Amino acid sequence: MNRRTFLATTVIGSLATGIGSAAAAAERYFPLKVDPALFESINRVKIPGKKSPLEMSHAPLITAPKSVKAGELFTVEVSVGERVHDMGPAHWIEYIELAIGNEPLGRIEFQPRGFMKPKATFSVVLPKDVAPSGVVTLVALQRCNLHGLWESTLDISVG
């Protein structure tokens, strides 16, 4: 074996070992598998009375008064899941959005380090013209890095 072949073999072997080690480390750091089907559309709870564990930890939970007065301030809280979703570098909630129907109200973005819990509080005032029928639908969206986009709705009456 000449020197050139020896050096080339050594370099290629070292690179292969380094890449293999990096891939193994990434698999240990990000061990969760992603279900691509969860990213094809908006996910919603299928049977409200019988939520799956995935639905219980990913469907946004909207907490708001059942009835509000037009022009008066009220609070809407959106948390991710009945059991609040864990936050960490391998699995986290990217954002929470709140809308009235198709009208966006606000968005809170999260980072994956886990400093914050996926909960957002919105202060809302609804003018009378927003609810000609006397009812509005609050729509909460959240996106999980591994389980896609989830949506929940809540109807409230506006007097």
Predicted regions and their residues:
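Short coil-to-beta strand junction motifs in C2/discoidin
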Residues: 88-94
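Exposed aromatic-hydrophobic patches
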Residues: 118-127, 153
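N-terminal secretory signal peptides and thylakoid transit peptides that target proteins
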Residues: 1-14
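Short amphipathic, basic-aromatic surface patches that mediate peripheral association
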Residues: 79-88
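Structural beta-strand segments of beta-rich domains
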Residues: 72-76
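Short acidic/polar inter-strand loop motif in beta-rich domains
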Residues: 143-153
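Solvent-exposed serine/threonine-rich low-complexity stretches and specific carbohydrate-binding patches
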Residues: 105-115
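C-terminal segment of N-terminal export signals and the immediately downstream linker at the start
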Residues: 20-62
